[in-house]
A protein has these predicted regions:
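Hydrophobic/small residue at the entry helix of a nucleotide-binding pocket
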Residues: 12
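Substrate-binding strand-loop-helix patch
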Residues: 189-196, 216-236, 245-253, 292
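Terminal hydrophobic/aromatic helix or amphipathic segment near a protein terminus
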Residues: 230-277, 310-311
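Substrate-positioning beta->alpha
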Residues: 162-169, 183-206, 213-217
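Amphipathic terminal alpha-helices
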Residues: 284, 292-311
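Conserved beta-loop-beta element that borders a ligand/cofactor-binding pocket
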Residues: 102, 134-159
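Conserved Rossmann-fold NAD(P)-dependent oxidoreductase catalytic core, especially the SDR/UDP-sugar
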Residues: 84-131, 148
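NAD(P)H-binding glycine-rich loop region in Rossmannoid oxidoreductase-like domains
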Residues: 35-36, 41-93
């Protein structure tokens, strides 16, 4: 089988590395701290923004999966160097570069998001993410690398913990039958991308030549409001109805005084105050991976949280 490099070991990086290892590939995971080896997975401690170091790690690999991101409040400062390093490593080794992206680059839109929308975001985080793909796409168009970006909405599912909007702040509480608070309008339709589908799309796109040179949306189930998702999770858990409340702006304002992460959320509040819907039909009509049925997502998520200590 082949060698794959996965940059980052958050929810998406871990899911991608384990999927590849399960398929029999050899996987090298790059993080700053490293970890103990796992079956089929070698963990390497390195700064992925160091292009010479990353190039050495990627020698012999067929693909580099970019699943890492700088700290949320440092995107504008640190994304350019990380993107440049990934591009340089792909060029030096011939590995396909698969970038895990998101939907920030589009900015606020009034329709379901498709890949042909312009990257028109004006905020610093949206511009930073748009610039990553613009930088990588230029290298691809110049014939220097082979690259693809796979864009996901907010992660949901087994393995999604602190960084998810329907994760550690919500699921353990609803499993106890307690009320939950969510960011923005709890009744606004919102697309939630299932984490196993993210990993499956990254792996599939790496090996599909027809995918390269453009961006694709990860197959994503039909949009559901936060209230609908909480209701589905509670029904699966058998806890009975759970109250869903909007986090008061005053609470967010006070918390932002002490938390850089919460402070940075102001730029993307539009994603939760209005419909935020992704159209993934282009990917699903071209490739084998399709969105996992929502009922299956809900069952697996409740089971995972219970297995990992939630009631």
């Amino acid at each position: 089988m082949s060698i794959h490099v996965v940059i980052g070991y958050g929810p998406a990086g871990a899911a991608t590395a384990r999927l590849l290892a399960g398929q029999g590939h050899s996987v090298r995971v790059v993080t700053r701290s490293g970890r103990r080896p796992e079956p089929g997975i070698e963990h390497v401690a390195a700064d992925a923004a160091d292009s010479a170091r990353l190039t050495g790690i990627a020698r012999g690999a067929v693909a580099i999966h970019g699943c890492a991101a700088p700290p949320y409040h440092r995107w504008a400062a640190q994304w350019p160097q990380l993107a440049a390093s990934m591009g340089a490593a792909a060029e030096a080794t011939g590995a396909v570069l698969v970038v895990l992206g998101n939907l920030y680059g589009y900015g606020p839109v009034d329709r379901p998001m498709t890949e042909d929308l312009p990257l028109a975001a004006t905020g610093p985080k949206g511009r930073a993410r748009a610039a990553v793909w613009e930088q990588v796409r230029t290298l691809h168009e110049e014939g220097r690398i082979r690259a693809v970006e796979v864009r996901a909405s907010d992660f949901f599912g087994p393995g999604v913990t602190d960084g998810g909007h329907l994760a550690s702040r919500v699921v353990p509480r609803l499993l106890r039958g307690r009320s939950v608070s969510v960011l923005g309008d709890p009744d606004a339709p919102h697309s939630w991308t299932y984490l196993p589908d993210v990993a499956a799309a990254l792996v599939e796109a790496a090996g599909a030549e027809q995918a390269w040179g453009r961006a694709w949306h990860v197959p994503t189930a039909p949009a559901q409001s936060a209230r609908q998702m909480v209701g589905r999770l509670a029904a699966e858990a058998g806890t009975g109805p759970v109250a869903v409340r909007r986090t008061p702006p005053a609470v967010l304002g006070a918390a932002s005084l002490f938390s850089p992460l919460i402070r940075e959320l102001r730029e993307i509040r539009y994603q939760f105050d209005r419909p935020f819907v992704v159209d993934s039909s282009a990917y699903e009509s071209a490739f084998a991976v399709h969105a996992t049925p929502l009922d299956e997502q809900i069952r697996a998520t409740v089971a995972w949280w219970r297995e990992h200590g939630a009631p």
